[in-house]
Amino acid sequence: MTDHADPLAPRLLTCDVLFTGMGGAQSPGGVVVVGGTVAATGDPAALRASYPHAREEAVGGVIAPPPVNAHTHLDMSRYEFTALPYFRWIPEVVVPQREKRSVEAALHGADTLRDLGSGGVGDIVYMHAPEVMDALLAREDLSGVLYYEALGTFPDRADDSFRTIRERLERWRRLERPGGPRVGLSPHTPHTVSHRLMRLLCDYAAGEGLPLQIHVAEHPAEQELYTRGGGPIWDNRLAPFYPETFAEVIGRAPEPGLTPVRYLDELGVLNARPTLIHMVNVTPDDIVRVARAGSAVVTCPRSNHHLECGVFPWAAFAAAGIEVALGTDSVASGGSLDVREDVAFARTLHPTLDPRVIVRAAVKGGHRVLGSRAPFIRRGEAWNEAYLWR
């Protein structure tokens, strides 16, 4: 009989899904832990046979390295959660509460991620609060990528905007340190960044090896914007911040069959292999273009549901071999910064999708988006109770 008081007595932890950080996940799974060290992983039945004296603990759920929050907005962590259609949510929620976007809010969000034991973060730093970047770069308990957000719909102002953004990025990159957050760039969306600025930013990022994130194909109303140049997004825009027509923003006439993904591809932006956020309302041709470019995508299941965006076509992206990661988006639209809640919600949205695929995406997919590496749960490695997703 195993002595429960013996610190070297083996424990057999069994779960519904095990992902060790290598290969694919398995279900069910188990981990044998001896004295704070992983002794074995694998099928529970095989582990019972190999370690008959181990004390078994049915922990259920998931055993895996901590999940990565691959897309969020930490400086919105003091916003109130509000569910509204996407095209109303920005003018009615984001803009009126913009005074809440601050260093204090971002640090509060970073504290929350630390307390959650997050495996890393892809954070969008608000363009008009650059001091947030300085504050987050200094955090020693934060890893991942801090993407400086760029907006600007007027093509004739693109060069001046680009110079300012480049100067800031170059200063921040000098503050990077081993093990700390990296600096990235996020041209907000194809319809809030002019064609000229979008191309300048993405060409620069590609040349400098800067990680990129772009919000793309989030809401169904984007289809009307790119095919007709109008619709709810255009009707609810903040008019002083836009030229007279949408055609001026994208540098071409809207037309039937034009999608945000096709527009970015034909503009040359996908050559920079940006990570594409949301990608809910896409066509089969869009998916082919993304796969050909080698871009990864991040899905934010709860946020997409709350903003009435639709359901991410996960199976189609998986079939095309596209890397998928998960993010919470901001607390204002997602509800919390705990990406494990998005994993659980994704399992309800995609009942026919193997849950092992979703767990792997939350870990391996997130690390691949951020250019980092997940810790491994394997023989000889230190055991961490944070590997139990509760």
Regions inferred by a protein language model and the residue ranges of each:
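Glycine-enriched alpha-helix->loop->beta-strand junction motifs that scaffold or abut catalytic
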Residues: 140-144, 204-211, 269-272, 289-298, ...
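N-terminal metal-binding scaffold of metallo-dependent hydrolase/deaminase domains
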Residues: 1-50, 372, 388
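Active-site metal-binding motif and surrounding structural segment of the metallo-beta-lactamase
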Residues: 46-64
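Histidine-centered catalytic micro-motifs
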Residues: 65-77, 211-220
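Active-site gating loops and adjacent loop-to-helix segments of metal-dependent hydrolytic enzymes
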Residues: 77-105, 145-148, 220-271, 346
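Alpha-helical scaffold segments that flank or form the walls of functional sites
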Residues: 62-63, 80-142, 163-178
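His/Asp/Glu-enriched, well-ordered alpha-helical/loop segment
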Residues: 233, 266-270, 312-390
